[in-house]
Amino acid sequence: MHNFVPTSIQLKPPFYAVDWQEVADNISSKTKMIIINSPHNPSGMLFSKDDMLELQDLAEKNDLLVLSDEVYEHIIFDGNVHQSASKFEALAERSFVTASFGKTFHNTGWKMGYCAAPEKLMKEFQKVHQFVVFCVNHPIQKALATYLKDKNHYWKLSDFYQQKRDFFLHLMEGSNFKIVPSKGTYFQMLDFTEISNENDIAFAEWLTKEHKIATIPTSVFNEGRKDFKQIRVCFAKTDETLAEAAKILREL
């Protein structure tokens, strides 16, 4: 849109931390916006308070807008706290925060979410949004508005998914995969460098065809298809499915 050209900052394993100096070095007079995603898909990384302060500093110094993708905001583990762009006063003034009812309430097929921003930004947002989204299901909007009144419907999500993550990681103990536990989302990265020399796409295809386990090769998320020999698995499954998958993966 408007002939914008994205500049990507490659997050690197095992922890996928943001190199803020690299971000600063890539900002030019043409830069208009920084886009972030936390909790991060596919890595499960979280932006810390220090990360958000670094972002706020860069955005203020360079007069940049921020698009903060926070669709996994309620799926965070190990006592960590979600650092929303809306929590930082100077950052909130220049940020669009997007979130997803689909991710929060297990109904991704409904394609329902929201964007929050200061009024002056939302007026500009709406000029574009009206040509991108034709309509949404109004009865479902009403239902979700009612459902949101009970905070227990989303405040308990972290515990629910952490049990899934911990269950899966416990079953994966002793495997040949290198694993850094996910800090958020319902995804877990698995490093297969000790198992295969194949690229991640070939390895994922082999897992699907030979072992009936569907994963995502993480190079498809990267600019230039950078291959770190990692796959992404989803642990938002029944315990029986996770146990069966872990048994197969442990034997590789």
Task: Report each predicted region and the residues it spans.
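Structural signature of PLP-dependent enzymes
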Residues: 125-132, 148-170, 196-199
